[in-house]
Amino acid sequence: MNKKAYFGEFGGSFVSELLVPALRELEQAFDACLKDEKFQKEYFRLLKDFVGRPSPLTLCQNIVSNPKVKLYLKREDLIHGGAHKTNQALGQALLAKKMGKTRIIAETGAGQHGVATAIACALLNLKCVVFMGSKDIKRQEMNVFRMHLLGAEVREVNSGSATLKDAVNEALRDWASSYKDTHYLLGTAAGPHPYPTMVKTFQKMIGDEVKSQILEKENRLPDYVIACVGGGSNAIGIFSAFLNDKEVKLIGVEPAGLGLETNKHGATLNKGRVGILHGNKTYLLQDDEGQIAESHSISAGLDYPGVGPEHSYLKESGRAVYESASDAEALEAFKLLCQKEGIIPALESSHALAYALKLAQKCEEESIIVVNLSGRGDKDLSTVYNALKGGLK
């Protein structure tokens, strides 16, 4: 057993024989790039000059009424592409180029990973094909248009629930027959080894930056670090720097959708059971017969019935706790951040903010809370408009 492939009992590489050589080649190339100074230098140059890192850490001025609480936002909404997805899309695309691949395939839910992949492919002159569920295409028309503008081909997926998990299935199918010239640029910290580790590595600068920024501003570490969790890449990116700092509480916030008591949610770690999906062992939403259940969230990027295996491990070990926020709570947090701070957040990030605002009200001691504002909300404006029927009161 490859111990590097596992986080406790979670992770692994449960794939068809056809994909074994592709994953082996990828793991070897990834391990080599970690030691390759030229690769690292080029990647960090692009993060600085093209992506716009480091992203700011912003202290909220008005949204928190409790005088004992300072709420900071890690502003991934301000980087090129509008979300944290660009960090790792660029890392993987650069790796693919180094491997001699000429074609990139990706899956996308909210469209942000598709846009980030299209951006990276345009920059590095790689052919780009993005698989997207028909349900998500309707929800995210502007991101589909962005992908087309950036030169990507968007392939509509109608199978299953026509959402993210089905787009992943189609991408894996394509890769099984095309891996000689194609890299599958998986969008979250899930899937078969080495993807969870690779995606975490290409997102860990979020947590590294927060750590140095908060020490500079406050001369101490935060009490809480909070991030939304769908697949979990933005969360593992910010958590990674604090895993050994036991005094820092790590909180992932899942989509409770219409309520955890309904079957219309995406709270995999709160309501799921352990199983295998998309090549890794992790918590999954399942029905009574063990089939993968459909997830629901107002946010397309959290609408996934699985979660990255390291989050399953962090839950089991108790190092992180996983809470949830409903569609209604996320919408309310979205409105509040717009009106109180002048920042339009992604609906995904609004789930983390919703929980952070509830927590802030309860804090009885001086507390510092950091929320990963994983993306901006331009893509969600029509969803929010329809949900609120155009009214903001």
UniProtKB/Swiss-Prot annotation:
Keywords: Amino-acid biosynthesis, Aromatic amino acid biosynthesis, Lyase, Pyridoxal phosphate, Tryptophan biosynthesis. It catalyses: (1S,2R)-1-C-(indol-3-yl)glycerol 3-phosphate + L-serine = D-glyceraldehyde 3-phosphate + L-tryptophan + H2O. The modification N6-(pyridoxal phosphate)lysine is found at residue 85. One of its GO terms (cellular component) is cytoplasm. Its EC number is 4.2.1.20. It comes from the Bacteria. Tetramer of two alpha and two beta chains. This is Tryptophan synthase beta chain. It comes from Helicobacter pylori (strain ATCC 700392 / 26695). The lineage of its organism: Bacteria, Pseudomonadati, Campylobacterota, Epsilonproteobacteria, Campylobacterales.
